[in-house]
C-alpha cells in the first residue's frame, strides 16, 4: 500500500527534520512516518531504490540513513521540497507509491 494522499489532513505533525514537517505516528526504528508537506515521502513504505533521486531534475531528495527500519536502512528525504517544480517525475517512477506531491 502506498502513501495516503490525505495524510496532511489525516495525520498529526509530530516533529520537524531538515526544515520539513514529519507526520506521525513515529516509533523508531520501525515507524518513521511521512516526511515533507509539499513533497511527502512515506518512510514506512519507501524501499530506497533511488528512482526518485535519479528522476528529480531539481534535487529535492537526499539520502537519509534509517538503521533498523524493516523496509530499508536509508530513505529518500525531501530536504529541498521547496525547490519542487511539480513535474511529478518522482511520483511516476516510485515502484511502491511512497511519494505524494501537492503544491502549497
Swiss-Prot record:
Binding site for [4Fe-4S] cluster: 56, 84, 87, 90
PANTHER family: ADENYLYLSULFATE REDUCTASE, BETA SUBUNIT (PTHR43687), L-ASPARTATE SEMIALDEHYDE SULFURTRANSFERASE IRON-SULFUR SUBUNIT (PTHR43687:SF6)
Keyword Iron-sulfur belongs to the record: yes
Residues bound to [3Fe-4S] cluster: 46, 52, 94
Single GO term (MF): oxidoreductase activity
Cofactor note: Binds 1 [3Fe-4S] cluster. Binds 1 [4Fe-4S] cluster.
Cofactor field: [3Fe-4S] cluster; [4Fe-4S] cluster; Zn(2+)
Pfam families associated with the record: Fer4_10
UniProtKB keywords: 3Fe-4S, 4Fe-4S, Electron transport, Iron, Iron-sulfur, Metal-binding, Repeat, Transport, Zinc
Gene coding for it: zfx2
Ranges where the record places region N-terminal extension: 2-37
Chain positions recorded as Zn(2+) binding sites: 17, 20, 35, 77
Record-given protein name: Zinc-containing ferredoxin-2
Its biological purpose: Ferredoxins are iron-sulfur proteins that transfer electrons in a wide variety of metabolic reactions.
Domain 4Fe-4S ferredoxin-type: 38-66, 75-104
Organism: Sulfurisphaera tokodaii (strain DSM 16993 / JCM 10545 / NBRC 100140 / 7)
TM helices/strands, residue ranges: none
Top-rank taxon, per record: Archaea
Gene3D superfamilies, per database record: 3.30.70.20
